[in-house]
Each structure stands twice: as structure tokens, then as C-alpha cells.
Amino acid sequence: MTAELLIEQFLNGLQFGFMLFLMSAGLTLIFGVMGLINLAHGSLYMIGAFSAAATFAFFNSFWLSLLASFSCAAIVGIVVEKTIIRKLYNRDHLDQVLVTFALILFFSELVRWIFGAFPLYLDVPELLNLSLIHISEPTRQVL
């Protein structure tokens, strides 16, 4: 194993760990502040990602797709909170888990129905595709 490969794998693990930390911090924050177990907040992450890929495929603009990603995830999150999640605030935690797990299944199937079962790709601008010290780890993953 070369030193470059070792550093690449270390950076991949660090990036993946940060992503897991952010998602688990969101779950902990929602439960700690609101007393609500919302397992479906990762589905909003997925909706944002698919809306970004679809916007990029249509307009071919990374920055517009980034804006669409945040906007779409925020709008869907607000609608879900006002229509479904608010009714769960005074309910038992088991009810919260069941409903939010049902939301995961619903959003997963909705995305599969709209976009299909194949992955979508997004070209990243060269600004975020720089290499670090002769290592092929993209800057966007470190950021």
C-alpha cells in the first residue's frame, strides 16, 4: 500500500465520518430540543440530492442545482413538519418512530417512482475539483 493510497483512504474515512456526524447530530438535536424522534430527516438529504441532480441535468448549472437542492429540501421539510410532524409532538415515541419510518419508505419510493432506480450524476465545477499535495482526493470531499 502506497502512502498516497493510505492518505486517500484516511481522507475518505474522515469525510464519511463527518457526514455521519452531521446526520447523527441532526437526529440528536431534533430529539434533544423538540423531544421528537424523526428518523426521516435523512430522506430530506436524499430529496435535496436528487433535486440537485435533476436541476443540473436540465439547466447544466452546478450553482443553480445547489440552490435548488437547499430550496427543495427546505420546502419539503416545512410541508412535512406542518402536515405530519406537528401531530406527533404529544404522541408516544413509538408512534413517532413508526410514522417517521413510514415517511422514509414513502420518500424512498417517491424518488424511485420519479427518477427511476438508476443513479443520477452531477458534474462538479473545476473550482471544487482541485487536488491536494499530489493526492487525487477532490477538494470538495475535504470541504
Predicted regions and their residues:
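Alpha-helical transmembrane segments of polytopic integral membrane proteins
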Residues: 23-33, 52, 76-77, 81-82, ...
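Structural signal for alpha-helical transmembrane segments and their membrane-water exit/capping regions
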Residues: 31-36, 70, 110-119
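Alpha-helical transmembrane segments within multi-pass membrane transporters and channels
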Residues: 60-104, 110
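Extracellular/periplasmic helix-loop junction at the C-terminal end of a transmembrane helix
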Residues: 98, 105-132
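Short, Lys/Arg-rich, polar N-terminal cytosolic tail immediately upstream
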Residues: 1-2
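Ser/Thr-centric signal marking residues that sit
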Residues: 28, 100, 139-140
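Single transmembrane alpha-helix segments in multi-pass membrane proteins
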Residues: 6-55, 83-95
